Amino acid sequence: MSSTILVIHGPNLNLLGKREPEVYGYLSLDDINQQLKTQAQASNISLETFQSNWEGAIVDRIHQAQIDGIQFILINPAALTHTSVAVRDALLGVAIPFIEVHLSNVHAREAFRHHSYLSDKAVGVICGFGAKGYHFALDYAIQKIQPST
């Protein structure tokens, strides 16, 4: 497995399965990560996951992704979606293609959740499909980085 995809989970996603399950679903973050790793392995793709409640740690991991040779990033920036120019600048700085993923439909929620600092630079945005959104994003990323045979 030479190609690697990085999945970054933002603040409070460590509480998945416990925090507002009617909004975010009943799967834990570990459940989602394991499902994604299995999906990636089926295509001979390596998958790394990272979660932090700290903006700076997420920025550092994005920077490290370039050093590590990551080919694609899937990011659920959670609340940082609406506030973080730093995460936006980090993603632009490393120039790794990324997809923005949200479990809930942010456009059907509070008005402050309607703006994203990332979406205009993302390859795409997937929201409102629960954990399935990560799988949709991973399918696309695999297609983009896998050599055609």
UniProtKB/Swiss-Prot annotation:
Organism lineage string: Bacteria, Pseudomonadati, Pseudomonadota, Gammaproteobacteria, Moraxellales
The transmembrane segments are none
Q: Which organism is it from?
A: Acinetobacter baylyi (strain ATCC 33305 / BD413 / ADP1)
Q: Identify the EC number(s).
A: 4.2.1.10
Identify this protein by name: 3-dehydroquinate dehydratase
Catalytic positions? Y24 (proton acceptor), H102 (proton donor)
Please tell me which top-level EC class this enzyme sits in: lyase
Keyword Nucleotide-binding assigned to the entry: answer is no
Q: Which keywords does UniProt give here?
A: Amino-acid biosynthesis, Aromatic amino acid biosynthesis, Lyase
An annotated Gene Ontology molecular function? 3-dehydroquinate dehydratase activity
Q: Where is this site: Transition state stabilizer?
A: R19
For this protein, the record's InterPro entries field holds: DHquinase_II (IPR001874), DHquinase_II_CS (IPR018509), DHquinase_II_sf (IPR036441)
Q: Which domain of life is it from?
A: Bacteria
